[in-house]
């Protein structure tokens, strides 16, 4: 029997299975962290538990620091109640290597965790106290791209945000309101310095975060519900910094294969759960071995020595180039392409799709031929080496059972950056967008996906997306030949990042989409454009 509890980490089962357990004093770490916190993190999901918390765990093991991390969760408090608290804040890390080995490690760097929403005022009040502490250096976030939104797709402020504008700082179900409110506490405590670091896959994430926070603060000052000077405090980088970052580590849902392996080793209580918010989570986190975190070195109150754990610190311009390299060329567009076609062709894993020669040709065409030529070399990471690793090592990893269905989530929010940026670069550099054949196939493929049918005409379940309700009726009318509906979707800059018709790509995308509507049309399109398989 095994228990994820720091008091039982000397049990024989951990040694027998070569689990790397912490050697530092966990109780001491927790005590001093809660007394004088230096690092708070919001967003208690899997990439934090394994990667980001793992970085601090490395520093603790090397005796570079004696502090841990305090965690907050606004979106899904079941994660805190049913995973963090039940497992004594510990995570069993499982790295799924290509060679089939699965090294195990206990990550123990989380000192405590709290829900922080309108139903969890006690947790919020804990953070009020923590934010008023002088030695707090950084607050990091992994709340997904949606977490930074304070407006809906029509540009209107969300109801909970409008409510906060009138009521002023306080606990909310919107994470941006909560962070703004807690920063106001820090301002009132003496304009104490702090860095607020987005670690989400979101281009210019520091800018996106700042704009949401500043907008809330501006409306508070305008409405007279905060003391004058709060906005000025946020805009002073010597007081509050919003460093940009690029993060990359594939961290899929808990794998049944891993659960079975752990149970055979004698570990109990490893069953994954699905919360009411549709979060898939378990006492363990499985992930690939590759990982990258590049951060703008702007921390007005100091920072952890995360470079000793492999983090790259650099300037903002370099972070931006690395992010663009990954998000618009070397990984994310390839992921989205595989996700869209994987859903329609019946695949259950990305690795399985990498055995499809036509899909591999498609992502190579998008990456090497179409996107890389307009990506700036960031120097600190080589783009060709990076994409080589993605295509040859990372995506084919059969142990990473990442699903097309998971990656297809929120695709409408991803397309403008993952594909729209490349189209914009072609236009600004005077290049012929007619050469963007691979990207056209993916955009048409996504429109075809929204019809909710696979290549055999059978119904498929579409992954969650905030624009589904709005787009599906338009796509269906377009599929039935309604010209105005087709034109309206092709001109959606908010969806594609550009007006596809004005960009010279509308006709090609429409043509490919219409071909894909036919029975087995998707396979036929792939054969036509990517060649027959051997």
Listing of model-derived features with the role each one plays in the protein:
Residues 1-534:
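Substrate/ligand-engaging "lid" and interaction regions
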